[in-house]
């Protein structure tokens, strides 16, 4: 890829303007100076304003001669978005072909980029965020953003035109005269796939907070919302007994309570029928059994039936027409919260501190994080909102608390969360019903989750420790023995977490041996295998 030119559009008191030029010396107008800088593999472009103005768009054009054998990967919008190597002439489908009533009822445009990104469906027109690469016969060229905290970086592959267009989010609002603002920071690297990712993260200065693998149990794929103290106590006992027979080395053993303990948004109002003693006793029991207690929370959303929705309408994120912004069809309807609202920020900090300090949960699975950046507002673009929201969570919890991000634009999570989901939810079957396969790119699918585990594996141990979602060894799912084996083998060789929702008491000796083999493979990859016998 070769940097060729830039284009910037802006508005002054004299009206809208647009200029384009090659990436040579600084380019000046009466309104601003554009300062591109190419230093080896690094490209930066900044502006210096001479008058008050609003930047409305910026793009950088890279030239690339695509070949018929090229494979292209563009990183999807968030954790669940499909991200795999594709033939260069592939088409990228959005939700344009879904009938409007279906789209609206199930809010199928809520979790992706469909509300603000174009999907033209043309062969070779692909887009993603933060990074992309082209690979042919082992040789790789990667373009990666060095900083997403000031805005997301969209990457558009136009194979038929021999171009890659870089479109960073621009500042929201008016810039004063004599301001300097960096619009984009990129790195272009070549080599093997591993060499490219290593060079990119070296340039960025980002390092993973941990490389310690996790093994353990989560309640979701066994009980879904139908959890209570008795069920989870039985699950904990089963997990304790099962792990007593497994060599886990230095892996962290986690027992995680997932969704279903309260109405979403009312995090401290734990359902007294399900958990008459609250959640703290279960967390204490998990610690006594040798596990790190974990808890699921979706910090930036609430459901329509919550007290929060009814009592704090001013905390809801609203569109230009004043309507609450829907994030999906989950629960009684999911709605985004305004993460810039001071009262909400105080409430969330209190919730997180109660969970981690008073209830003593030491791992938080923070989910549906994309809700924080549904709409640019309060002077912040989407990338700035996501960065700010994650920093709010990180600063509210004790330093030793581990964060597992999910449903998050990945670039914002680099170096911030300890563990991160890198694919969609697995299902209890292989690829869902036939009619589901034409829906959004974030849909539940074991097949697509597994593909994402491979596609995003280079991030593991560099950006964070990768969470591939759970595996299944139980036989009451609609997965063949070969599919279950492939899922577990892929997880232990491409990621850093081996979590299950199986009733581990029902595993036979063959299943236990298969799991032990997978744990050994996981530990060997991470260097955490301190117990394996020679």
Explain the meaning of each model-derived region.
Residues 2-251:
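Carbohydrate-recognition beta-sandwich/jelly-roll modules
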Residues 45, 56-59, 295-299, 367-368, ...:
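Glycine-rich, histidine-containing beta strand-loop boundary motifs that form or position
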Residues 166-170, 174, 194, 199, ...:
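Mature catalytic domains of secreted/periplasmic carbohydrate-active enzymes
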Residues 217, 221-353, 357-375:
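Aromatic-lined carbohydrate-binding/catalytic grooves of carbohydrate-active enzymes
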Residues 223-227, 262-266, 300-305, 371-375, ...:
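Flexible loop/turn segments at secondary-structure boundaries
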Residues 279-286, 382-401:
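Alpha-helix-loop-beta-strand connector modules within alpha/beta enzyme cores
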Residues 309-346, 350, 391-506:
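Glycan-recognition surfaces
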Residues 502-534:
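Non-catalytic C-terminal accessory modules of carbohydrate-active enzymes
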């Amino acid at each position: 890829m070769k940097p060729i030119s830039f284009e910037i559009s802006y508005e002054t008191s004299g009206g809208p303007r647009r200029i384009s030029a090659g990436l040579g010396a600084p380019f000046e107008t009466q309104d601003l100076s554009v300062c591109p800088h190419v230093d080896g593999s690094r490209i930066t472009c900044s502006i210096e304003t001479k008058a008050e103005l609003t930047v409305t768009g910026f793009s950088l054009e890279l030239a690339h001669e695509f070949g018929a054998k090229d494979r292209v990967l563009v990183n999807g919008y968030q954790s669940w978005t499909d991200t795999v190597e594709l033939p260069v002439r592939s088409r990228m489908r959005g939700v344009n072909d879904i009938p409007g009533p279906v789209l609206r009822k199930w809010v199928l445009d809520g979790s992706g980029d469909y509300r603000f990104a174009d999907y033209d469906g043309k062969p070779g027109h692909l887009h993603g965020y933060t990074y992309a690469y082209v690979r042919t016969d082992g040789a790789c060229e990667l373009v990666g953003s060095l900083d997403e905290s000031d805005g997301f970086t969209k990457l558009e592959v136009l194979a038929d035109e021999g171009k890659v267009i870089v479109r960073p989010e621009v500042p929201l609002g008016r810039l004063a005269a004599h301001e300097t603002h960096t619009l984009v920071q990129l790195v272009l690297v070549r080599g093997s796939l591993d060499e490219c990712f290593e060079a990119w993260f070296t340039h960025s200065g980002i390092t993973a907070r941990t490389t310690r693998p996790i093994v353990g149990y989560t309640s979701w794929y066994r009980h879904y919302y139908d959890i209570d103290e008795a069920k989870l106590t039985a699950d904990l006992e089963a997990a304790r007994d099962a792990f007593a027979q497994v060599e886990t080395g230095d892996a962290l053993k986690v027992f995680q309570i997932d969704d279903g303990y309260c109405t979403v948004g009312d995090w401290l109002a734990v359902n007294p029928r399900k958990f008459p003693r609250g959640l703290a006793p279960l967390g204490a029991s998990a610690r006594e059994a040798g596990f790190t207690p974990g808890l699921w929370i979706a910090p930036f959303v609430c459901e329509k039936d919550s007290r929060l929705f009814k009592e704090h309408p001013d905390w809801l994120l609203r569109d230009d027409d004043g309507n609450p912004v829907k994030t999906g069809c989950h629960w009684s309807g999911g709605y985004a919260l305004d993460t810039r609202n001071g009262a909400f920020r105080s409430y969330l900090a209190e919730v997180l501190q109660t969970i981690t300090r008073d209830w003593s949960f030491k791992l938080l699975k923070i989910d549906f994080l994309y809700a924080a950046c549904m709409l640019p507002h309060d002077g912040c673009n989407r990338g700035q909102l996501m960065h700010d929201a994650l920093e709010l969570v990180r600063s509210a919890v004790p330093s030793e608390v581990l964060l597992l991000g999910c449903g998050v634009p990945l670039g914002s999570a680099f170096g911030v969360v300890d563990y991160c989901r890198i694919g969609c939810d697995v299902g209890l079957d292989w690829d869902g019903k036939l009619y589901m396969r034409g829906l959004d790119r974030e849909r539940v699918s074991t097949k697509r989750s597994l593909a994402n585990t491979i596609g995003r594996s280079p991030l593991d141990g560099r950006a964070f420790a990768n969470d591939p979602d759970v595996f299944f060894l139980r036989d009451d799912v609609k997965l063949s023995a070969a599919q279950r084996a492939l899922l577990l083998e892929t997880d232990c060789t491409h990621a850093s977490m081996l979590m299950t929702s199986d009733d581990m008491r029902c595993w036979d000796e063959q299943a236990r041996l298969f799991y032990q083999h997978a744990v050994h493979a996981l530990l060997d990859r991470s260097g955490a295998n301190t117990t394996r016998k020679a």
